């Protein structure tokens, strides 16, 4: 998504993911301004449709398609966390979960505290959060393969999750009635059912058809850390943190996979942990 100025200069384009994430942030901002804030009467973004740009393909190239994603060393991971502690603390917990459990970005954001068993050190992955451009909503749906899976984790992530829970309880006390709670709404369209995500603070009336859900990855005010804002955080890292020029959230999943395989885990076991449809996908990471 780039272009050429009238004077002939070519502007560097933005990636598709960047455009969609930026659009999602605008959608949410304007929607919030309409309701509950009532600052404007309508959402101007509801009339915006993003253009699709066809990817150019060299039909006669002999080159094989390569992902090119490299695993992150533990030293670089620790450097990333230190950077985020200063620049973007809400992004830390989802990145830690993905690094130690190999979840996709939507699965990470979709985790609830009910999905986590700290005593047995395992988590259940059964939902994912994504932005639906057609509906202009964040929706809660199934995982990519539409299957429930269980992932074990160790002492490090256990302590991280316990600390996060304590911090969230502390934030709830500090924010008081301004602390946000998260909800989903069941929507029926023709023969389909989907679930929209919403968040409201304690001063706002909760509609009767909203059901509360206790997500794990929260912002300080209690609202959900969404995949779109996580994507923006990762792009910021790739631009500003030395050595992370090609960083993206999915790289954490690659790292988790690489660590398991290099430590002798059976490919079939890793496949099940990751929720891949076949073992060849796992081995190509």
Please give the residue ranges for each predicted region.
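Short, conserved phosphate-binding/catalytic loop or strand-edge motifs used
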Residues: 1-6, 50-53, 257
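Conserved tyrosine-mediated DNA breakage-rejoining catalytic core shared by Y-recombinases
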Residues: 50-53, 111-208
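Generic recognition of well-ordered alpha-helical segments
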Residues: 24, 28, 155, 159, ...
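Catalytic-site neighborhood detector that most strongly recognizes the C-terminal catalytic loop/helix
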Residues: 129-131, 255, 274-285
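A short, basic/aromatic helix-end/turn motif that makes direct DNA contacts
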Residues: 110-116, 271-277, 285
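Basic, Lys/Arg- and aromatic-enriched nucleic-acid-binding interface segment
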Residues: 10-16, 20-24, 39-40, 46-105, ...
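Short, basic (Lys/Arg/His-rich) helix/loop patches that form interaction surfaces
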Residues: 8, 12, 82-91, 101, ...
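N-terminal core-binding DNA-recognition domain of tyrosine site-specific recombinases/integrases
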Residues: 1-32, 38, 223-229, 246-251
